[in-house]
């Protein structure tokens, strides 16, 4: 959400707060999908709904797909969608979700190394910022805006 806000501020664009939904995850993914779908339905039923949605993870992107299907909104013709994480369900959905892929294996390795280092150096605090590469896996949920 922070990047969405910064993007708009930097370009002097009106921030559409009514396009933002913060979803708290439950224990079960299916509960989270249903909760997210309800929020997305509210957004998509607005007088001027968005033509694109960036979901902070692929589970939420699946909820967007369900909401769009329920409202008979054609993805990607009338709504583009991008998720994040490249979970298996993203490639198995119909249409397959365009997603940002992170290097999960490398992230796991770095996390384990940091944890082991921290456990052996308990009093040592080393704030560290690690930037990792990611890539866009373009699949079936994005297209050029239809109203241009």
Language-model features, listed with the residues they occupy:
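Short beta-strand elements in bilobed, periplasmic/extracellular small-molecule ligand-binding domains
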Residues: 1, 5-33
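Flexible loop/turn connectors
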Residues: 39-148
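Adenosine-nucleotide cofactor-binding segment
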Residues: 36
């Amino acid at each position: 959400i922070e990047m969405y806000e910064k993007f708009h501020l930097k370009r002097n664009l009106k921030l559409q707060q009514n396009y933002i939904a913060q979803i708290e995850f439950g224990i079960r993914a299916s509960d989270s999908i249903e909760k997210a779908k309800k929020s997305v339905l509210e957004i998509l039923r607005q007088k001027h709904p968005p033509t694109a949605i960036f979901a902070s993870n692929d589970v939420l992107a699946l909820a967007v797909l369900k909401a769009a299907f329920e409202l008979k909104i054609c993805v990607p013709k009338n709504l583009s969608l991008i998720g994040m994480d490249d979970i298996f369900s993203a490639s198995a959905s119909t249409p397959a979700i365009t997603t940002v892929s992170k290097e999960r294996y490398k992230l796991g390795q770095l996390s384990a190394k940091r944890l082991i280092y921290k456990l052996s150096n308990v009093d040592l605090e080393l704030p560290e910022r690690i930037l990792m590469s990611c890539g866009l896996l373009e699949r079936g949920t994005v297209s050029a805006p239809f109203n241009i």
